[in-house]
């Protein structure tokens, strides 16, 4: 709708230039907003005010010239008014609005998909949990956020890759191996004083028991280094497989799994440091090699190579992000836990040091999740190794509720996840409320079939039969969906789609509760059936976009 309106305004401006009524010769960006009050029209533009300086005229005079050149817009609007200092307000005709329904029917599952991204390549890297333990609910929120960000970008016309970065280098894998080895020896009857810096969870004991069952006691006398390597590899492989299974149960699939160790195996870390050295961005102090990140806004410089010769995690992050852009991505998005917020400036510095625009790297921070049961917070303590896993929550409330609830707030705000509410089979449950709207339309369709009311085809509906205010309001809301998708993609905010779904479901339920869709007048029945099935299409498209099902019966 906005696109059509912009086209008419642009044509009117060009006509004004051609007829020497306006003289700047440049059409500015035409912003269209929905006024806060309905009496001010359906859309409003400030284009006249934007042109005032270049035209050296009062905005109202410019607005009068534009309005005179607009004509009737092919029946798109009933009237156009000038308000305040020079706003141009458009009042669209109901017939224009109801044309949106034909577009929904014409595009079907593709309605809401746009070409805004124009095929630009974007990588979204998310979850990337260490393969040292199962995924917890914090990882789950990151998974839902990253997957939904990738989905809305894809719907907006970007070429998207989903990547999981496997942190399989460094001390954490050795710590996992040691934890598993010690639990294995405990199971063999040895008395072990388990170190506090080892992984404490029950899952480590379970893995050790698996090793004992499959390998017996033969690993007891292995040399320490060989034993650690075996248990680290065994534990890492098993946990990685478990992570993959949990993500599959959550409906998340990655296009690429990228190993941190591979950066070392291919000397990418060395090459990354060498490049920074060549550019004069490093220096030596206290036997260590430092990157001058303060040159690019960081609060202090960062170590790349420690005085003992060991590289830092930051060094591998430099190499990893360098390699990402070498793969041809225009934009790279990292989804991190909010506790990594202090890491953002140094990664922006990396891009500047690599002669990339720091804005080519976008970082989405995901805040904590508070699980609630019976109104009380569920205890979670990673120190003791006992924590609520993502799989436990999926098993308790289901994938749909899990994904929807994780996306109900901005990712950078804390989230209270009410387990009791998520399990309710009632309209109190936000995801049930939205899915029920879809199921209700499907029920109407079954009733229509039973009554012999055929589903109208494109062009077979008399929109003059849609006379209720709620019918026009629903149609206006449907027209907004492509814009919601574009906004969610532009700002990396998939919660906008959730908010939209809740608004659309509420509007539909209100319409449904006020009267019948199928009435004695067949033309009215067919028009209403056409409308509610457009609602069903948009509900389906938006739910699927978020990885949530759209059930036909509930």
Curated annotation (Swiss-Prot):
A GO cellular component annotation in the UniProt record: cytoplasm
Record GO biological process: arginyl-tRNA aminoacylation
Top enzyme class: ligase
Annotated catalysed reactions: tRNA(Arg) + L-arginine + ATP = L-arginyl-tRNA(Arg) + AMP + diphosphate
Documented EC number(s): 6.1.1.19
Subcellular localization: Cytoplasm
UniProt-recorded Gene Ontology molecular function terms: arginine-tRNA ligase activity; ATP binding
Residue span of motif 'HIGH' region: 129-139
Record key words, sorted: Aminoacyl-tRNA synthetase, ATP-binding, Cytoplasm, Ligase, Nucleotide-binding, Protein biosynthesis
InterPro entries: aa-tRNA-synth_I_CS (IPR001412), Arg-tRNA-ligase (IPR001278), Arg-tRNA-synth_N (IPR005148), Arg-tRNA-synth_N_sf (IPR036695), ArgRS_core (IPR035684), DALR_anticod-bd (IPR008909), Rossmann-like_a/b/a_fold (IPR014729), tRNAsynth_Ia_anticodon-bd (IPR009080)
Matching PANTHER family: ARGININE--TRNA LIGASE, CYTOPLASMIC, ARGINYL-TRNA SYNTHETASE
Family statement drawn from the similarity comment of this UniProt entry: Belongs to the class-I aminoacyl-tRNA synthetase family.
Subunit structure: Monomer.
Protein name: Arginine--tRNA ligase
Species in which this protein is naturally found: Syntrophotalea carbinolica (strain DSM 2380 / NBRC 103641 / GraBd1)
Gene name as annotated: argS
